[in-house]
């Protein structure tokens, strides 16, 4: 029995010492879930909008039809930090809040996309896989909640047979540009309590 206990205990102790050494060497600024972490001073960010405070960004879609698509991968910083709202191609995409068009972009992943900055500057709303922008939509243009800004599509890496709006929300610190900020799950902001 003693021999069995030693054959189990010794390898277990070795593993524990090895883990302790790794933690000691890597220090507090490392995370096994996402690589390097920011151990510097935290920059204050704008508070997220209250739950249910945003307009639904696709015309004709009810709050009850929304599904939470937020996924975070425990092994990396990647995941799906958005909500996908399926709709027929060409369905109007609406601004979720009053704001200003910060950037119109065309990319491999998001395809035709819009970055809208909230009126207070503390939030970016990202609309992707758009078929096209609304006529005369331009960077710097003020938009109102519910205003048509684009149409649902399948541009970028969206599946050709599955048109949808990919919608993200990013909380911004003062001075951060449109591509920065911290992702916030948009589902509760759109869905709300009812």
What are these language model-derived features?
Residues 23-112, 145, 154, 183-194:
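Surface-exposed, glycine-biased beta-strand/turn segments
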Residues 57-59, 76-77, 108, 120, ...:
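Extracellular/periplasmic catalytic domains that process cell-envelope and extracellular macromolecules
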């Amino acid at each position: 029995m003693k021999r069995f206990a030693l054959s189990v205990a010794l390898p277990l102790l070795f593993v524990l010492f090895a883990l302790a050494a790794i933690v000691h060497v890597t220090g507090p600024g490392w995370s096994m879930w996402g690589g390097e972490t920011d151990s510097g001073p935290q920059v204050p960010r704008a508070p997220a909008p209250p739950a249910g405070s945003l307009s639904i960004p696709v015309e004709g879609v009810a709050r009850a039809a929304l599904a939470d698509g937020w996924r975070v991968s425990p092994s990396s910083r990647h995941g799906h930090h958005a909500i996908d709202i399926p709709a027929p191609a060409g369905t109007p995409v609406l601004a979720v809040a009053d704001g200003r068009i910060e950037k119109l972009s065309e990319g491999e992943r998001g395809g035709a996309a819009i970055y809208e900055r909230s009126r207070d500057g503390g939030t970016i709303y990202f609309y992707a896989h758009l078929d096209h922008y609304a006529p005369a939509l331009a960077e710097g243009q003020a938009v109102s909640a519910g205003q048509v800004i684009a149409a649902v599509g399948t541009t970028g890496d969206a599946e050709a047979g599955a048109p949808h709006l990919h919608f993200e929300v990013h909380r911004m610190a003062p001075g951060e540009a449109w591509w920065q900020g911290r992702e916030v799950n948009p589902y509760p902001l759109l869905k709300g309590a009812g």
